[in-house]
Structures are given as structure tokens and as C-alpha cells.
């Protein structure tokens, strides 16, 4: 295989081209990475020296003959440089995918190295111009002293892609930190909302227990007062109404005796006397006159004297019974008031609990809104980071397309040179 130009008569053999290409190769490992730029520079300088020598010799040979002079265009980056382009872009794409997958900024060193090699466009141009002007003997030393740069350092699109990668590298950590803060805010808001739920439940339980205890206590007190009222009424009936009824009956019987009605007859019942029980409890016996049908005057006088006292006793029993009824009514009222007060107290406890629950629900709503806001902000931040990664991926795709175009142009130039 040979590369040449028919009109100029210049020809470079396959072995010589292989020797020149092999000059740019270096051993594997870290040393290969460090010497990559120097090897490429030496290979370019050697190639330029060989081409310069052949062109100069041929120019001197054809100067006197008057042949037409053919000027060659500046060659495009060689295959080794294009391979370096492809490797660089592939490495960027691989590291970008790893960064997007892990969300961990681990490609800082690679980006820094690339930026250090490509950040100074003027330095690269100056080094290249100086390398062209130097002679063939000084080319290796000049290439060795030149900064380690790739041949495509003049590409502004690639510089823009590197700048985008560096900016993205700086933003990833801040994106992760912000997303972490927003996630923690959402978590704290969720925990606060859960605490408010527990507080509402505790308030409801406390209100239920306190209201139930108060209502039970007041209901029991009211029931006891009602029982006292019933007991007072029962006692009044037993101690007042029954004696009053007996006195009324005896008083009626005595009144009938005074009128001569139901007078005892000895021939029928063989009763010869009448016993009368006084207010003091003393029983007085009166003999019945056997000689006539009416009571004696003494007997009638005694009965007439005791009638007002019996009537007074009957009235007093009635009054005491009325007093007992009033007392029972007061006890009944106390019982009703206790029960009503218990219900009122329970309602107050329920109202206070409802107020506390309302305040807790308001705080819960605020916490839920804060959680939703934090989640929305985190989602927006994640979407922005996703768009940034997509932009970086587009830049990498553009760089790959540019490398492919360079390869196509180089292939076209090589084809033209063969023909």
C-alpha cells in the first residue's frame, strides 16, 4: 500500500508509513496514558519531517526543468488522531452513562484532564505553528517540549462539549444535595402530619374518657339523689300517712259514737266498756251505761274533749307529709341537676376536644401542603437534572457525529490521494 500524488511524483511506502505510525505507539497502562500526547506529537513531527524532506528534494529537482508546481493542502488529522477522537468521545459517553445511572459524581478526574489539555486554544495554535516552522532535526525536541494536547484541540464544538461536561459535573453534586434536602423536608412534613394524626386520636380518646367519666359520675350522683327522694317519700307514707289514716278512722268512729250511731248493745256483743287511746298513748277505759240506749254524759264529754286533739294530730301528719314531699322534690331536683350538669360538662369536653382537633387538623393540612410542595420541588429539580443529562447526551451525540464526519472527510482525502 502506498499514498502518493501522481503530478508531484511523491510516494510514501507502506513500510515507511508503518514505521511512522509505530512511532506513536506506546506501552499499555498508565505510562501509555501519560505518553499518548507526546507520542502523537512525535509521530506528527516525524511525518512532517519526512514529507518536508521529500517535497524539498523533489522541488529542487524540478525547479530547473520548469515543471508545474503542485501545492498540497494541509492534511487532515491522521488515523491515529481520529482514533483518539473516537476513544475520547466513547469514554465521555461511557462515563456519562455511568454518572446518569449511579447519580454519583465520579468522573471529575477525567473531565479535569480533558479540560487541562483543551482549555488553551491559543497555546495549541502557537505550538502547532512553531512545529511547522521548525526544521526536521528540531521537530522531536519541539514536540517533546510542547504541551500534551490532541490534534482536535482547535475544535470549538468539542470545547463546548467539554465545558458542558465540566459544568454538569459541578451541578450534579448540588442537584443531589438539593434533592436530599427536599426529600428530608418531605419526610419531616410526613412525620409531622403523622404526629398530628396521633395527637388528634389522643385528643379524641382523652375527650371520650373524660366525658364518659364525668357523665358516669354525675349520673350516679343524680341517681343517688333520686333514690333519696324516693326513700323520703316512702318514709313519709309509712310514718305520716298511715298514722293519719288511722287517726281519721278513729275520729270518724268517735264522731259516730257521739251521735249515738253504732252504739254497742250488750245483748248482742256483751261489751260493757269502751277503751279510748289518748294522744299520749295512754288507754282510758269508760264503762257503758247498761240502763239506757245513749252514752252517759261523762262519756260524751270525754269524747268531745279529745276530738280537737285528734284532728290536730291528723293535720300535723298531713303537714309533715307535705314537708317530706318537698324534701323529696329537692332531692329529685338535685339528681336531675347532677345529670344535666354531667351532660353539659361532657358537651364542654367534647367542644374543647373538637377545638384542639381542629387546630391539629389545620397543622396537619399545613404539613401535608409542605410535603406536597417539597415533593413537587424535588420532582422539578429531578426533571431539571434529567434535562441537563439529556443536553449532555445530545452534546456527546453531536461530538460523535463530528468524529464520524471527520472520518468520512479523511477517508475521502485518502481516496483522492490514492487516485
Swiss-Prot record:
Any idea which UniProt keywords this protein has? Secreted, Virulence
- Residue numbers spanned by region Disordered: 60-91, 338-402
Q: Where in the cell is it found?
A: Secreted
Q: Which domain of life is it from?
A: Bacteria
Q: Where is the composition biased (Basic and acidic residues)?
A: 71-91, 380-392
| Keyword Nucleus tagged | no
What is one term from the GO cellular component aspect held by the record?
extracellular region
Q: Does the keyword Secreted apply?
A: yes
- Family affiliation: Belongs to the SctB/SipC family.
Protein name, per record: Effector protein BipC
**The organism's lineage?**
Bacteria, Pseudomonadati, Pseudomonadota, Betaproteobacteria, Burkholderiales
Amino acid at each position: 500500500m502506498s499514498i502518493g500524488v501522481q503530478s508531484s511524483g511523491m510516494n510514501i511506502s507502506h513500510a515507511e508509513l508503518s514505521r511512522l505510525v509505530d512511532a506513536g505507539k506506546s506501552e499499555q497502562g498508565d505510562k501509555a496514558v501519560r505518553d499518548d500526547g507526546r507520542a502523537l506529537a512525535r509521530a506528527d513531527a516525524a511525518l512532517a519531517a519526512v514529507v518536508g524532506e521529500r517535497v524539498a528534494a523533489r522541488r529542487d529537482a524540478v525547479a530547473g526543468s520548469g515543471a508545474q508546481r503542485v501545492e498540497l493542502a494541509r492534511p487532515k488529522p491522521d488515523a491515529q488522531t481520529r482514533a483518539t477522537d473516537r476513544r475520547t468521545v466513547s469514554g465521555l459517553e461511557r462515563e456519562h452513562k455511568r454518572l446518569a445511572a449511579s447519580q454519583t459524581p465520579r468522573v471529575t478526574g477525567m473531565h479535569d484532564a480533558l479540560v487541562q489539555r483543551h482549555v488553551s486554544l491559543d497555546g495549541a495554535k502557537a505550538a502547532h505553528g512553531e512545529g511547522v516552522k521548525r526544521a526536521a532535526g528540531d521537530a522531536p525536541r519541539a514536540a517533546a517540549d510542547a504541551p500534551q494536547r490532541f490534534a482536535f484541540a482547535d475544535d470549538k464544538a468539542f470545547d463546548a462539549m467539554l465545558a458542558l461536561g465540566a459544568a454538569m459535573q459541578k451541578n450534579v453534586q448540588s442537584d443531589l444535595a438539593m434533592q436530599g434536602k427536599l426529600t428530608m423536608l418531605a419526610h419531616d412534613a410526613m412525620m409531622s402530619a403523622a404526629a398530628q394524626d396521633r395527637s388528634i386520636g389522643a385528643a379524641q380518646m382523652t375527650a371520650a374518657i373524660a366525658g364518659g367519666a364525668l357523665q358516669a359520675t354525675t349520673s350516679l350522683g343524680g341517681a343517688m339523689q333520686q333514690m333519696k327522694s324516693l326513700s323520703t317519700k316512702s318514709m313519709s307514707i309509712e310514718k305520716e300517712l298511715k298514722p293519719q289514716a288511722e287517726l281519721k278512722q278513729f275520729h270518724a268512729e268517735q264522731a259516730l259514737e257521739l251521735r249515738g250511731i253504732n252504739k254497742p248493745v250488750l245483748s248482742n256483743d256483751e261489751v260493757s266498756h269502751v277503751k279510748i287511746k289518748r294522744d299520749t298513748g295512754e288507754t282510758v277505759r269508760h264503762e257503758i251505761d247498761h240502763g239506757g240506749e245513749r252514752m252517759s254524759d261523762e262519756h260524751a264529754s270525754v269524747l268531745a274533749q279529745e276530738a280537737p286533739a285528734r284532728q290536730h294530730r291528723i293535720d300535723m301528719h298531713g303537714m309533715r307529709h307535705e314537708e317530706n314531699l318537698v324534701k323529696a322534690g329537692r332531692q329529685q331536683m338535685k339528681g336531675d341537676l347532677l345529670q344535666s350538669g354531667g351532660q353539659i360538662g361532657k358537651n364542654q369536653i367534647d367542644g374543647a376536644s373538637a377545638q384542639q382537633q381542629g387546630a391539629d387538623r389545620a397543622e396537619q393540612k399545613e404539613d401535608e401542603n409542605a410535603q406536597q410542595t417539597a415533593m413537587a420541588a424535588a420532582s422539578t429539580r429531578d426533571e431539571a437534572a434529567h434535562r441537563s443529562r439529556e443536553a449532555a447526551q445530545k452534546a456527546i451525540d453531536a461530538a460523535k457525529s463530528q468524529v464520524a464526519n471527520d472520518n468520512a472527510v479523511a477517508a475521502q482525502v485518502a481516496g483522492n490521494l490514492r487516485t
